[in-house]
Amino acid sequence: MRILVLSDSHKKQYNLFVAIEAEPTAEVVYFLGDGATEYEEAVFAFSHEKAFIGVRGNCDMYTSLPSLDIRTVCDKKIMATHGYEQNVKFGLYDLQLDAVSNKCNIVLFGHTHTPLSLYKDGIYYFNPGALKDGCYGVIDITDSGIICINKNLNIY
């Protein structure tokens, strides 16, 4: 299964739509905040093709999206958050505490605008970077394991 991971679109709706169209085999789209309005428009446009899971970011003032989502996808427990509540700009310590206490296999976060793919102590930590800058990510969950890939839209 391919999962598309997006974050920090910051009003760049075009980038959001291009990223979704660039990954036609993605079955699930995670949006990690700071662009809730664009996310809601993408859900409206693409929900007949893909499942959408979103969380709010620190810039998403008027949304009902949760700040944290934990669910099992393809037999892997995935935690999604924007990251500001876990102070990710100052390190991953708080995020790691949440991941371990919730027994997660994969942690998705944004906020820093910096792509990151890290495997530590049995947990994958993945930040797709800022979609406003053309960064996004995909995660492939296969029988062989988990592969996290940071990508660029190549539209700049």
Stretches with model-predicted labels:
Residues M1-E49, D60-Y62, P66-S67, I141-S144, ...:
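N-terminal active-site segment of His-dependent metallophosphoesterases
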Residues R2-I3, V100-K103, K120-Y156:
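Binuclear metal-dependent phosphoesterase catalytic core
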Residues V5-S7, V29-D34, I53-N58, M79-H82, ...:
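Active-site neighborhood of phospho(di)ester-bond hydrolases with catalytic His/Asp-centered motifs
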Residues H10-Y14, A36-E40, C59-S64, Q86-G91, ...:
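Active-site environment of divalent metal-dependent phosphoester hydrolases
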Residues F44, L68-T72, P115-S117:
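Short secondary-structure boundary/capping segments
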Residues H48-A51, I123:
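A short helix->loop->beta-strand "cap" motif at the edges of active sites that frequently abuts
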Residues A51-V88:
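Helix-adjacent hinge/juxtasegments
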Residues F90-A99:
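Charged helix-capping and loop-helix junction motifs
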